[in-house]
């Protein structure tokens, strides 16, 4: 994981502006503690804080084209970089072994087209199609800023789902600023906001524009493809789709295996986050399968590190820890169980909110143990981990999905959840780990895997009544896991580290925030007024760190049950008067639901 800061549309380069960029970059140095770099030229400044994962020796950034006419700052990993390099053999002289350098070659190819300049004047559609084509060639997680010094133009882009964070801001002088975390922009801009996933910003046609589009964004395409009978209820739809299940299981198995294998590229020690739930257990088991050799050369040489290390965190006696140990013993990882106390968690919350830059209740709850775990992982020399984020959004794994009335409601909710993931679990996983200089990779959100998983018949993902959630994933990988884990009910990470963690947070915040404060919450916080005392408590800390309106607007604040969107609250009458993100809020489904 790295950190980037860039300033564009500079009218005059000055020593003061360079120092401003350096100060901004220093605020995110935790993301990239291995090296710092900066470029100042033309109308741009690009600064970079590096965490070296691939090509530690020569991959320092910013990266330059062979003739120095283009410069690039990237936070991310391009998993198909070897294929792109092969395509440019003899046509582009790469300067480093960095996977991210392929972005420069793709940009140069695009810009070298004889008709590209005319596209700028032909109309937005033609220009948009050409830039989108370039960005679609990348399979990876990324946020980048590219400056073309020859033409004095720039291109900014973010990965399809928003695994890598990025923010964009504008100052009173017309400058455009981007940074990996909002703390670098706080106080520097008149306005800033999250840079949207799957979008780009091209200076010759300003504004964020979506390049990542898929047929599965719309349920109508899925309904037509699979001839789903929308007149039927969930149970009947599921019965109709049963003949397709076997093929779907194999497709998911093969696609996820390929995703994990792609994401194991690394020149430094790596591990896996193993919570003991289904998703992290599947990722860990598949990673263990390929970890003994280097995926970069097709498994022809042994891995630099002989054993895969797995990590779990929780309070003593937490439900996840025993299951994580069981999985680790089953698949053969070197397992590390990290215990923390409730007081240690409470003491960390102020720092956690500073690093993750949110006041969302679920995110703060889950980020705290992850933040504590990341510190231990880094102390052991691990710089990259694979994690299971995204599976619940893709496959409808949250317990409230049991209440989905039909395939249309189910599929549209998964699309909504994926579209908002950059504000929640992607943010948590990235920033909690990056606080200690660790990169997190998420195979369930791999672009090629998503085309398979989101393109499958949504009926096969449904879990009406007592049907177990994520059945297709369980069947695809049951042979790699202990049976009691393969068929274990979904447990949210913030619950699984220990129920007493959540219960104590509720008690502490309930006593720390008075009824009078809650009554006047909208006066103190007119933007997204806190909906409960726990959110008020976190919001107060957030406002101390980041007092601007832009910061407040960057965080979502919507009613939710068990991590649902607001739209899904109509699925069950019991959701109507609830606002609790815990899975225990789904009565009749969670085995230890609230009484």
Question: Where do the model's predicted regions map?
Answer:
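Adenosyl-5′-phosphate
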Residues: 1, 234-237, 379-386, 405, ...
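Short, motif-level signal for alpha-helix interfacial/capping segments enriched in acidic residues
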Residues: 9-12, 367, 422-427
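Short, well-ordered loop/turn and helix-capping segments at boundaries between secondary-structure elements
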Residues: 10, 90, 109, 289, ...
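Generic recognition of stable, solvent-exposed alpha-helical segments in well-folded globular domains
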Residues: 19, 98, 247, 251, ...
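Short acidic/histidine-rich active-site segments
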Residues: 382-392, 398
């Amino acid at each position: 994981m790295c950190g980037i800061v860039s300033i564009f549309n500079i009218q005059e380069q000055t020593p003061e502006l360079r120092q401003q960029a350096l100060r901004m970059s220093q605020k995110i140095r935790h993301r990239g503690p291995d090296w710092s770099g900066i470029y100042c030229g033309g109308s741009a400044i690009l600064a970079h804080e590096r965490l070296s994962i691939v090509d530690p020796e020569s991959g320092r950034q910013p990266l330059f084209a062979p003739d120095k006419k283009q410069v690039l700052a990237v936070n991310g990993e391009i998993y198909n970089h070897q294929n792109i390099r092969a395509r440019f053999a003899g046509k582009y002289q790469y300067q480093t072994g960095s996977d991210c350098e392929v972005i420069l070659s793709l940009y140069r190819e695009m810009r070298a087209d004889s008709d590209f300049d005319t596209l700028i004047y032909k109309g937005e559609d033609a220009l948009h199609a050409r830039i989108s084509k370039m960005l679609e060639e990348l399979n990876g997680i990324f946020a980048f800023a590219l400056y073309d010094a020859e033409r004095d133009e720039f291109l900014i882009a973010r990965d399809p789902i928003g695994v890598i964070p990025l923010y964009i801001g504008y100052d009173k002088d017309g400058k455009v600023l981007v940074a990996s975390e909002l703390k670098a922009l706080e106080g520097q801009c008149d306005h800033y906001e999250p840079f949207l996933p799957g979008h780009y910003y091209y200076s010759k046609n300003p504004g964020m524009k979506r390049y990542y589009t898929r047929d599965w964004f719309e349920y109508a395409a899925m309904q037509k493809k699979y001839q789903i009978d929308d007149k039927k209820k969930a149970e009947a739809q599921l019965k109709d789709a049963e003949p397709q299940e076997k093929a779907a299981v194999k497709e998911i198995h093969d696609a996820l295996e390929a995703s994990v294998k792609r994401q194991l590229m690394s020149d430094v020690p790596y591990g896996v986050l193993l919570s003991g739930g289904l998703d992290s257990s599947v990722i860990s088991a598949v990673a263990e399968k390929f970890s003994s050799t280097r995926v970069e050369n097709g498994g022809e040489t042994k891995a630099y590190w002989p054993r895969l290390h797995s990590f779990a965190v929780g309070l003593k006696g937490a439900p996840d820890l025993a299951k994580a140990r069981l999985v680790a013993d089953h698949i053969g990882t070197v397992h590390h169980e990290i215990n923390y106390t409730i007081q240690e968690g409470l003491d960390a919350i102020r720092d956690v909110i500073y690093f993750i830059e949110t006041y969302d209740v679920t995110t703060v709850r889950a980020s705290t143990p992850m933040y504590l775990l990341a510190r231990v992982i880094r102390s052991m020399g691990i710089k990259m981990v694979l994690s299971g984020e995204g599976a619940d959004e893709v496959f409808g794994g949250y317990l409230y999905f049991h209440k989905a009335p039909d395939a249309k409601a189910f599929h549209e909710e998964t699309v909504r959840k994926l579209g908002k993931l950059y504000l929640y679990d992607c943010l948590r996983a990235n920033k909690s780990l990056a606080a200690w200089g660790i990169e997190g990779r998420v195979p369930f959100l791999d672009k090629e895997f998503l085309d398979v998983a989101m393109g499958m018949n949504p009926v096969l993902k449904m879990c009406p009544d007592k049907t177990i959630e994520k059945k297709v994933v369980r069947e695809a990988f049951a042979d790699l896991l202990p049976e009691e884990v393969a068929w274990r009910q979904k447990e949210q990470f913030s619950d699984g580290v220990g129920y007493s963690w959540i219960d104590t947070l509720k008690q502490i915040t309930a006593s720390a925030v008075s009824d009078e404060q809650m009554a006047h919450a909208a006066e103190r916080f007119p933007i997204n007024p806190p909906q409960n005392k726990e959110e008020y408590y976190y919001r107060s800390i957030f406002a101390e760190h980041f007092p601007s309106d832009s910061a407040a607007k960057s965080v979502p604040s919507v009613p939710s049950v068990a991590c649902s969107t607001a739209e899904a609250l109509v699925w069950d009458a019991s959701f109507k008067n609830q606002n609790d993100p815990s899975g225990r809020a789904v009565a009749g489904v969670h085995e230890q639901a609230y009484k």
